[in-house]
């Protein structure tokens, strides 16, 4: 499950319409438990599942990865799936599952080179380096191109998941946390970041290597 310190914003614009075109990486006829069944009925969650599996496969296929590291990655993925399926215990199972997927996507992209090599085939980008004068540390940002889209920011031991909202220009993301409102407005090489209890910061966004 996600660390307790995650600042999980309220998921905005939840999709509940009919006509789910996407399908997850697993066979929905064999879906087990509440979470897998929910994923099969939810277009956004199905896309997140397929993207997570794609990135995991790219990480696992790296020729330079040692046998012991592959075993560790396999164990980590099994543990993550168990944690995702435990989201049935959460007060908002969908928000929990969404956050689990995006956190896993971020970690796969951050920790392995393979998942960053075929972005044209997926729906995620990053992690980008976000440098903000006045911030506690360097911020890493991963972006997810679903409907709605998401921005996932991590720094030190903090994590913040924001949902995309309407904007006249650029890409604006917002979240409601226990501490207050948060906002990240990506305008190309620059972005504006607002965190609860702190003044707005103008940041520079740098593409991953």
Regions found by a protein language model. Name each.
Residues 1-10:
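Bacterial N-terminal signal peptides that target proteins for export
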Residues 22-209:
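N-terminal alpha-helical modules
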């Amino acid at each position: 499950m996600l660390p307790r310190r995650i600042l999980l914003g309220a998921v905005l614009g939840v999709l509940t319409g009919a006509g789910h075109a996407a399908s997850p990486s697993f066979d929905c006829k064999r879906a087990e438990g509440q979470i897998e069944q929910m994923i099969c009925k939810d277009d956004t969650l199905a896309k997140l599942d397929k993207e997570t599996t794609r990135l995991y496969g790219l990480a696992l296929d790296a020729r330079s990865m040692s046998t012991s590291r592959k075993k560790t990655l396999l164990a980590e993925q099994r543990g993550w799936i168990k944690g995702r399926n435990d989201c049935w215990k959460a007060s908002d199972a969908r928000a929990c599952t969404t956050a689990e997927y995006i956190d896993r996507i971020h970690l796969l992209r951050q920790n392995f080179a393979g998942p960053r090599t075929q972005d044209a085939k997926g729906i995620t980008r990053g992690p980008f380096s976000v440098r903000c004068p006045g911030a506690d540390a360097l911020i890493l940002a991963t972006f997810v191109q679903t409907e709605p889209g998401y921005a996932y920011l991590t720094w030190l031991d903090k994590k913040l998941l924001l949902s995309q909202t309407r904007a006249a220009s650029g890409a604006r993301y917002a979240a409601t946390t226990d501490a207050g409102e948060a906002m990240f407005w990506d305008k190309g090489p620059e972005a504006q970041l607002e965190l609860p209890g702190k003044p707005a910061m103008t940041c520079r966004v740098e593409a991953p290597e």
